[in-house]
Amino acid sequence: MFAKAFRVKSNTAIKGSDRRKLRADVAAVFPTLGTDQVSELVPGKEELNIVKLYAHRGDAVTVYVSGGNPILFELEKNLYPTVYTLWSYPDLLPTFTTWPLVLEKLVGGADLMLPGLVVPPAGLPQVQKGDLCAVALVGNRAPVAVGVAAMSTAEMLASGLKGRGFCVLHSYQDHLWRSGDKSSPPSIAPLALNPPDLSEGKGCVKADTALQGAMRQLTLEEEVQQRCEEKSPSEATEDPGPGGLHVDPMDSKTLQEQMDELLQTCFLHALKCSVRKADLPLLTSTLLGSHMFSCCPEGRQLDIKKSSYKKLSKFLQHMQQEQIIQVQELSKGVESIVAVDWKHPRITSFVIPEPSPTSQTIQEGSREQPYHPPDIKPLYCVPASMTLLFQESGHKKGSVLEGSEVRTFVINYAKKNDLVDADNKNLVKLDPILCDCILEKDEQHTVTKLPWDSLLGRCLEKLQPAYQVTFPGQEPIVKKGRICPIDITLAQKASNKKVTVVRNLEAYGLDPRSVAATLQQRCQASTTVTSAPGLKDSVQVQIQGNQIHHLGRLLLEEYRLPRKHIQGLEKAPKPGKKK
């Protein structure tokens, strides 16, 4: 969660009532702490700050800081200790042990896989799925990571210590640790415990005897040396090794079997959630590019060539044999899906995968937090010509107002100066200031009254346009002028080829290169990012062909941008016409 830099929203001293509440919460969440220890962790008079921040994936986190070090953090109303706290209270949480080489992966945001656990003679601590746990390294009981158990101890042993063991939230050397004094873990000797009797059913659970023996015989240096001698660096990275950090937890299956399973998952997910009856007939290439790719789980990449089917057409033929879909060649060489049986048991029984909010991928190309559109609010700046009108309310040249504030001020000004027509309440008499501010020169001797709507409209027209952009988790940004819409155009290239050009993505917090990569996958067309001509420090995205339909769907439906901020959507190809 803190593998990358976070953004601080606020940092305030804690109130007395909040301090008492925090102390009560700590006592409830960590019952092993005595009263004196709780008071020591959450001091009564010493400085204690509440820091509200946003993690790099957008999670809102509250951090409690004492003595310059983060001691606790709160996520989704759950309280977690930091490594600084665990170094003072190493027995606060059930602690699992792993190899020192794994720490680097944990700091990078990876979860801890079960093959990376070191099983002590006393067996593994007894935990349930979802329990808060600590992770320490071989030879030192000082925890270096905090996480949540992905399964119970019994399930871990039943799985043969394979799969994901812990979702890691915070670790030594991550950015939360860096916000403190950056001290190193203390040296705490491991406890010398004898293996318990399983019949007692208490404390810890012993692992398989053969597994324990094998784990005890392994030393980190010997295994690392052996793997380095036998495998290339790229192969060694893929191998779980002592760290047990697999990119794919389904290590018991071949790559081809995994890809077959992923292909069917994306196919069923797309039919259940993305494809609609109105989309039929649907080009098979569109099914793959616009629907199946977007349903691929985070951290995984769909590659049909690595599956047993090798080609999309062969896979769809198999799905047609199962009577899930019906495929026809509506035009020569081009296949389309013409019917879908949405009542088919495989579709109705398909469970949409829900990714864990704390799950991370150790792949370099892992996705960032989902895009959230900014809140865009029109504003108005007071120009020199309108200063006389607004100075009564304390505004001066350059002051920024919302439309509702302008309306309220004009109404109050008219009433305060007795300008509302006594015979017709819908009319406002114009005093010298209003005449100078909102009337044209040729009107100043002829127009003496205006209706309310005309008065307010003219006033807004005379003010200078501005706007406020607020991105989630960031402070509002005010800029003068009108925000430029996302501009979509078609350009004619050599050989009568068309390209779709998109500009001004940056103004809405969109990364042009990320958008280009997404469109390349969705449209199955080449994309390039180039400098926008005539626009300093701005770039444009070019997509081969008329891809405005795909682009509009991406901007409107997935990114949820208002249509009024996008121009050029009307140039999308009409249904039935060749792009």
From Swiss-Prot:
<dbReference type="InterPro" id="IPR015947">
    <property type="entry name" value="PUA-like_sf"/>
</dbReference>
<dbReference type="Pfam" id="PF17832">
    <property type="entry name" value="Pre-PUA"/>
</dbReference>
<dbReference type="InterPro" id="IPR048247">
    <property type="entry name" value="eIF2D_N"/>
</dbReference>
<dbReference type="InterPro" id="IPR041366">
    <property type="entry name" value="Pre-PUA"/>
</dbReference>
<keyword id="KW-0396">Initiation factor</keyword>
<dbReference type="Pfam" id="PF25304">
    <property type="entry name" value="WH_eIF2D"/>
</dbReference>
<keyword id="KW-0007">Acetylation</keyword>
<feature type="modified residue" description="N-acetylmethionine">
    <location>
        <position position="1"/>
    </location>
</feature>
<dbReference type="InterPro" id="IPR048248">
    <property type="entry name" value="PUA_eIF2d-like"/>
</dbReference>
<feature type="region of interest" description="Disordered">
    <location>
        <begin position="222"/>
        <end position="250"/>
    </location>
</feature>
<dbReference type="InterPro" id="IPR039757">
    <property type="entry name" value="EIF2D"/>
</dbReference>
<dbReference type="InterPro" id="IPR001950">
    <property type="entry name" value="SUI1"/>
</dbReference>
<dbReference type="GO" id="GO:0003723">
    <property type="term" value="F:RNA binding"/>
</dbReference>
<dbReference type="InterPro" id="IPR002478">
    <property type="entry name" value="PUA"/>
</dbReference>
<dbReference type="InterPro" id="IPR036885">
    <property type="entry name" value="SWIB_MDM2_dom_sf"/>
</dbReference>
<feature type="modified residue" description="Phosphoserine">
    <location>
        <position position="356"/>
    </location>
</feature>
<feature type="modified residue" description="Phosphoserine">
    <location>
        <position position="232"/>
    </location>
</feature>
<dbReference type="GO" id="GO:0001731">
    <property type="term" value="P:formation of translation preinitiation complex"/>
</dbReference>
<dbReference type="Pfam" id="PF01253">
    <property type="entry name" value="SUI1"/>
</dbReference>
<dbReference type="InterPro" id="IPR039759">
    <property type="entry name" value="eIF2D_SUI1"/>
</dbReference>
<keyword id="KW-0597">Phosphoprotein</keyword>
<keyword id="KW-0963">Cytoplasm</keyword>
<feature type="domain" description="PUA">
    <location>
        <begin position="93"/>
        <end position="173"/>
    </location>
</feature>
<feature type="domain" description="SUI1">
    <location>
        <begin position="486"/>
        <end position="559"/>
    </location>
</feature>
<keyword id="KW-0648">Protein biosynthesis</keyword>
<dbReference type="GO" id="GO:0003743">
    <property type="term" value="F:translation initiation factor activity"/>
</dbReference>
<feature type="domain" description="SWIB/MDM2">
    <location>
        <begin position="378"/>
        <end position="462"/>
    </location>
</feature>
<feature type="compositionally biased region" description="Basic and acidic residues">
    <location>
        <begin position="224"/>
        <end position="233"/>
    </location>
</feature>
<dbReference type="GO" id="GO:0005737">
    <property type="term" value="C:cytoplasm"/>
</dbReference>
<comment type="similarity">
    <text>Belongs to the eIF2D family.</text>
</comment>
<protein>
    <recommendedName>
        <fullName>Eukaryotic translation initiation factor 2D</fullName>
    </recommendedName>
</protein>
<dbReference type="InterPro" id="IPR003121">
    <property type="entry name" value="SWIB_MDM2_domain"/>
</dbReference>
<comment type="function">
    <text>Translation initiation factor that is able to deliver tRNA to the P-site of the eukaryotic ribosome in a GTP-independent manner. The binding of Met-tRNA(I) occurs after the AUG codon finds its position in the P-site of 40S ribosomes, the situation that takes place during initiation complex formation on some specific RNAs. Its activity in tRNA binding with 40S subunits does not require the presence of the aminoacyl moiety. Possesses the unique ability to deliver non-Met (elongator) tRNAs into the P-site of the 40S subunit.</text>
</comment>
<dbReference type="InterPro" id="IPR036877">
    <property type="entry name" value="SUI1_dom_sf"/>
</dbReference>
